[in-house]
Amino acid sequence: MPSMDIVSEVNEVELRNAVDNSVRELKSRFDFRGKEASIEYKDHVVTLSAEDDFQCQQLVDILRMQMSKRNVDPKSMDVDDKAVHSGKTFSLRVKFKEGIETLIAKKLVKLIKDSKLKVQSSIQGDSVRVTGKKRDDLQAVMALAREADLGQPFQFNNFRD
């Protein structure tokens, strides 16, 4: 009986590469010449700091663009609402969503059940296990999960036949 797990993970290596590319772009951008701005990555948190709130938002856009280039879904970003002002710099903290929260998992299971596909889905910690009789049903669930706008990207692993 085919089964798979629906998870939400961020590829650590690709994320680090995206941050490094963002730092490189920051150093070469003309509008940041002579300005004090930085992008730092530590313990699954990216800290963006700049002299102005507008520049912090530009740094977020740079990071999003580089993440897209490295195939890391920007939906996994959880950006602070307001930049923290300390001294002469503004800083934003960007955290990344790991695992599927219980509320989102319940919505996903309900979405799968409402689709009338012949599959069973169950919440297992921070992932959702889906089993069905046919591989085509699981592929339909994959398409359904990708289309669903639940504010979080999903990956599929442990696909067994």
From Swiss-Prot:
InterPro entries: DUF520, UPF0234-like_C, UPF0234_N, YajQ-like_sf. One of its GO terms (cellular component) is cytosol. GO terms for molecular function: nucleotide binding. Gene3D superfamilies: 3.30.70.860, YajQ-like, domain 2 (3.30.70.990). Pfam families: DUF520. Keywords: Nucleotide-binding. The keyword Phosphoprotein does not apply. Belongs to the YajQ family. Nucleotide-binding protein. This is Nucleotide-binding protein swp_1151. It comes from Shewanella piezotolerans (strain WP3 / JCM 13877).
